[in-house]
Amino acid sequence: MAVPKRKTSKTRRDKRRASSYKLPRVTITTCPNCGSPKLPHRVCKECGHYDGKQVVDNSEQN
């Protein structure tokens, strides 16, 4: 039966476990219409454009 040759330290154990806790970095792009930061593949919150077209009318909010 396989047995570990040495005791695994708490630091080494925690470093191994921590790799699964890492969150992916959020990608932020700029809106080509107004230049404000936005998430990719989503409508711009500032101007309401998506894929070069006006999708949402934001004039009521302002």
UniProtKB/Swiss-Prot annotation:
Key word Ribonucleoprotein present: yes
Biased composition, class Basic residues, residue ranges: 1-19
Region of interest (Disordered), residue spans: 1-20
InterPro entries: Ribosomal_bL32, Ribosomal_bL32_bact, Ribosomal_zn-bd
GO MF, one example: structural constituent of ribosome
GO biological process: one example: translation
GO terms under cellular component: large ribosomal subunit
Keywords carried by this UniProt record: Ribonucleoprotein, Ribosomal protein
Signal peptide, first to last residue: none
Source domain of life: Bacteria
Stored Gene3D superfamilies: Single helix bin (1.20.5.640)
Entry similarity comment: Belongs to the bacterial ribosomal protein bL32 family.
Name assigned to this protein: Large ribosomal subunit protein bL32
Source organism: Finegoldia magna (strain ATCC 29328 / DSM 20472 / WAL 2508) (Peptostreptococcus magnus)
Biological classification of the source: Bacteria, Bacillati, Bacillota, Tissierellia, Tissierellales
The gene coding this protein: rpmF
